[in-house]
Regions:
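Active-site-proximal substrate-binding core of FAD-dependent oxidoreductases
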Residues: 242, 488-498
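A conserved FAD-binding loop/helix module that cradles the flavin
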Residues: 54, 465-487
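N-terminal glycine-rich phosphate/pyrophosphate-binding loop and immediately adjacent elements
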Residues: 2-128, 439
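Mid-domain catalytic core of redox enzymes
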Residues: 208, 238-357
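A glycine-rich dinucleotide-binding beta-alpha-beta segment and adjacent secondary-structure elements
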Residues: 169-183, 187, 405-469
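C-terminal segments that line or cap access tunnels to active or ligand-binding sites in enzymes
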Residues: 309-420
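Helical element adjacent to the flavin cofactor pocket in flavoenzyme catalytic cores
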Residues: 196-248
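Rossmann-like flavin
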Residues: 94-190
Length: 498
């Protein structure tokens, strides 16, 4: 039986672990933190529970792509609460709200009511989204349907380039990209294919996870252990050991040694390179390229506990923009931050499948560049000093003020709040510069910002959000890519069909 060490217990590490364990590998996952799950993990404050990264998922209705993957990974027990089908995302541009509905017909009809002169163009846009999603065998889970020409074209054209070529109304152009904080898109850089996959993912169906996203991590861990694998926390890998040809094991911070026939790294590529110091199998050019990778912007979050019975539950996500355009919010200045924000409620555990009447807690999320918190890098969580706490409070008050202006009554409903910065993400997940979604895609750099799942070390592979895309579907597609290297794609597709 081959011994497999997986570094990191995020969704990529856990899902790879389950697939390999059920196919005969002896899997051990090593997690640096005290809690499993990476961006799936949750935390409690003052009696309420908050999610940190995975707030809602798509395509989880029976027969849809994510539902099939969840079934394959034996996650049929995950509770789901459907977001409003008539408006799962609400985009607010300079005070005017637009709703995005699930399903082809409702999506087109709803936007056509506000933009009747654009109906044909909306149909063209939606058809293209579906065509791109279907053209990817990985995203459609139809192995024979891969269309390389379509995939390539929309990986090298930017979101704004394609949207502007289809849609003529400038307001509608902005509405269609209004949820871009979900992938930290940048104008002229982010490929349209990224937008298409994410739009298709949520347009099919959208759900929150009652009780929190850590249910996914716990379910995968239970399944892994049932197949004989294990997850160990407080095990930060500091070195990957190699002989002259291959990796042989890892060393953790507590100086434990773990021998391995195969190593999977579910970490940011920059962290992987740090584990491979003085390893001649890795060339200097590769190290330099990894360190030069562009990363998506970080985020500042305010986690709010509401006074009981004061905040009606929002069964949708709210994207609020001060200006008519959602673009360039990451290019804020000290004077105009925040240019935009994402506002969501957490779905509490529900026993009867009903939609809650009131929210217990919610989150505000806006962009924050790492340079704003870099002076505190190297300090420990909870011990960064009074200046850091004052900085966070000032930012939180500004973000709450802006959200309250767009959503009156929000501030009055807050009983208490807590915050996180890009530094929090760096310390808990190891993502470079606290980046929300890891490595950024940039059509102008082409393959230079694409991270291969394979390395020059034959038995060392990468998985997680950096090798394909982030989010539930993006990471699981990356998992299939990585595991196909070991089991063949045919084996995995056949198992998914079973």
């Amino acid at each position: 039986m081959k011994r497999c060490i997986i570094i990191g217990s995020g969704l990529g590490g856990l899902s790879c672990g389950v697939i390999l364990a059920r196919n005969g590998y002896q899997v051990t996952i090593l997690e640096q933190g005290t809690q499993i799950g990476g961006c799936l993990q949750c935390f409690r404050r003052d009696g309420v529970k908050f999610e940190t990264g995975m707030h809602f998922i798509g395509s989880a209705e029976r027969g849809q792509t994510l539902h099939r993957l969840m079934h394959y990974l034996e996650m049929d027990n995950i509770p789901l609460s459907r977001l409003d089908k008539h408006g799962y995302d609400v985009i607010s541009l300079s005070g005017e709200c637009f709703r995005l509905a699930n399903g082809r017909g409702p999506f087109i009809e709803q936007l056509s009511e506000r933009f009747p002169h654009e109906t044909d163009h909306i149909v063209t846009y939606y058809d293209l989204i579906e065509e791109i999603a279907r053209a990817s065998s990985l995203h459609s889970l139809r192995q024979a349907d891969n269309n390389a020409a379509i995939n390539t074209e929309y990986q090298i054209r930017s979101i704004d380039n394609v949207v502007d070529s289809i849609i003529t109304d400038p307001i509608l152009r902005n509405v269609l990209v209004g949820n871009l904080p979900l992938y930290a898109a940048e104008k002229g850089k982010t490929p349209f294919a990224t937008h298409a996959f994410i739009t298709d993912f949520y347009n099919q169906s959208a759900f929150r996870i009652p009780g929190g996203s850590d249910a996914i991590a716990h379910s995968l861990t239970d399944t892994l252990r049932r197949y004989g694998g294990d997850v160990m926390t407080r095990k930060k890998v500091t070195h990957i050991l190699c002989d002259s040809e291959k990796a042989t094991g890892v060393v953790t911070e507590d100086e434990s040694h773990y021998a391995a026939d195969l190593i999977l790294a579910s970490v940011h590529p920059s962290r992987l390179v740090e584990m491979l110091l003085d390893i001649p199998l890795i060339r200097p050019a590769y190290r330099a390229r990894i360190h030069q990778l562009p990363n998506t912007t970080g985020g500042f979050a305010v986690y709010m506990k509401f006074k009981p019975g004061t905040m009606p539950y929002l069964n949708h996500n709210y994207y609020g923009y001060r200006d008519p355009s959602p673009w360039a919010c990451e290019q804020y200045t000290d004077d105009d931050w925040p240019r935009g924000f994402l506002y969501m409620h957490m779905c509490p555990t529900v026993t009867d499948g009903s939609i809650p009447r009131f929210a217990e807690c919610g989150e505000l999320l806006s962009y924050m560049r790492f340079d704003e918190v870099e002076r505190w890098k190297g300090t420990q969580v909870g011990h960064r000093g009074a200046d850091y706490e004052a900085f966070k409070q000032a930012k939180a008050e500004r973000l709450i003020d802006e959200a309250n202006r767009q959503c009156p009554g929000l501030r009055a409903a807050i009983a208490a709040y807590w915050t996180s910065t890009p530094l929090t993400y760096l310390d808990y997940t190891g993502t470079e510069a606290g980046s929300m979604y890891g490595v950024a895609k940039d059509i102008n750099k082409g393959a230079a910002c694409h991270v291969q799942h394979k390395t020059k070390i034959p038995n060392l592979l990468l998985t997680g959000q950096n090798i394909n895309s982030h989010g539930m579907l993006g990471v699981l597609v990356g998992t299939i890519v990585t595991c196909s290297e070991l089991l063949t794609a045919e084996t995995i597709y056949q198992q998914i069909k079973e």
